[in-house]
Amino acid sequence: QKALHSSKISLELFQDFLEKDSLFLNNRYSIFLFTFLALILGGLSSSDTPNDVWYQELNKSFLNPPGYIFGLVWPILYFLMSISAYRTFPNTRNLFLLQLFFNAIWSWIFFAFHLPLLALVIIWLLIGLNIKLNIDLYKLDKLSAILFIPYVVWLFFASYLNLFIVVNN
């Protein structure tokens, strides 16, 4: 219950942050900074994954790629996401930042706190948010929607990997 209350407070603070008429938030270049910060925060939680005994002992899918693949894929996806968000700024800013927030906390929930079931719920939420975001992007700028598709596809793949771990461990 305490964790739920903390999550509610965090989301309320995040919402207040988004609603502020901030020059920084209304600057389309800030989207690159937020994307970079999310990449760094997510990376910090999983930087020790190859040496993490908990992760190594999990039963993983035969489709689970080697760790270096994640290190190659995520920066590319973040780059494509940030270009997409930049092209449609500020129309999709709030939804983009919200999904970015959940993307960053997924890594912490899964890798740092070892809560794969909660991480699975978060990734399903991420998929829903990003389908909605991609629909919005398509209405505004078709190229932005196309740039976002690899991320959505990767989220489906990541949710499969996450589900496999939940079911088989």
Model-derived regions, located:
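N-terminal signal-anchor transmembrane alpha helix
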Residues: 25-45
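Core segments of transmembrane alpha-helices
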Residues: 74-85, 99-102
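Juxtamembrane boundary at the C-terminal end of a transmembrane helix
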Residues: 160-169
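Short aromatic-rich membrane-water interface segments that cap or initiate transmembrane helices
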Residues: 60-72
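Membrane-interface helix termini and inter-helical loops of multi-pass transporters
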Residues: 49-62
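Intrinsic disorder
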Residues: 7-10
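Membrane-interface helix caps and helix-loop-helix hairpins in membrane proteins
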Residues: 108-118, 168-169
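Interfacial loop-to-transmembrane junctions
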Residues: 137-153
